[in-house]
Amino acid sequence: MLRRNSHLGVKHNFIKNLNGVSMKIKLALEWFLNPDHLPFLVAKDKNIFKDLNIDLEIIEPDDHYDGFSELTNGNIEFATNEPLHLIEKYHSNIISLGNFFETNGGIIFSENGYKKLLDDQLVKISSPVSNNVTDTIALDIIKKHLENLSVIRQKKTNIIVKDFYHIKNIKDGLDAAWLCFENFEGVESRLEGLKVKKIYLENVNIPNFCALDLFTSKSFFENNKNLCKDFKKGTEEAIKIIINDLDYALYVYYSKTKQEKTELMNSIIEDTYKRFLTPFHNSLEKWKSLYDYTIKNKISDISQTEYSSMFAKI
């Protein structure tokens, strides 16, 4: 369920903008508000959305998949999430408007945890979720890495459901954490001075999906194409500002979130602000290799036609 959800349950199949009246638009994030969402904070701060007659409400979810659920039900207009979650199964009423952010990532092991992996001991990996999709990929990362080292492993690797505080979980004794992003956990592990072993997707030739797309519903898009185009262009305009002005990125993040300034958050923003993409990357083309990987590894069973239908031509 989405937080601040008093507005939910009201469907918005058609929104018409008349006489410059601002439209209330709801965007559900994939997790808690963080620097990956800077474009939306900047677009609000610079009145980019306001000038487009868009009154944006940003919503944090209780669950990682809430945004997709609310899009499907017509309760919100936009959502952000990793492209993998679009591809892992067919969504008849969800489409991507493009890819606006990409980092790199995978599994981060503690020094001792990685030694246990190589020594064929039981290994415990923390993850915010455990399901066939994410577990299959995590175990495939390990399998491919060990094959590259010609290491044979017999003992079990367990995925332990924890929260998303990956580095804390490693410090608390778990052997590794997944899915870690370089601009977050990579930064934090360096700042903490931890001795870790990173096994990222690109290290084992698995297509990257440590990224965020902007999603809407097909029904909303069909009835509001101009608004969707405006929202995308407004976000792209905000990204142009961010990637050229670290000081402003720092300012707007703290001013909009009211968070206390910390060395960790400063470092995360400094690593993040250059990773935004403008114009958005074409997701249909960009995630094709990821789609092929999910089909080959029986993670997804959607057809090529279904895959192609989940991306907007915009």
Please name every model-derived segment.
Residues 83, 165-257:
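Pocket-lining segment of extracytoplasmic ligand-binding domains
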Residues 12:
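Cationic, low-complexity basic patches in intrinsically disordered or flexible, solvent-exposed regions
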Residues 3-4:
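Basic polycationic patches enriched in arginine
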Residues 24-159, 175-179:
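Short, glycine-/small- and polar/acidic-enriched structural segments
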Residues 224-296:
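Secondary-structure end/capping motifs
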Residues 149-158, 257-270, 300-307:
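Short, surface-exposed acidic
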Residues 291-314:
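Conserved C-terminal helix/tail region of periplasmic/extracytoplasmic solute-binding proteins
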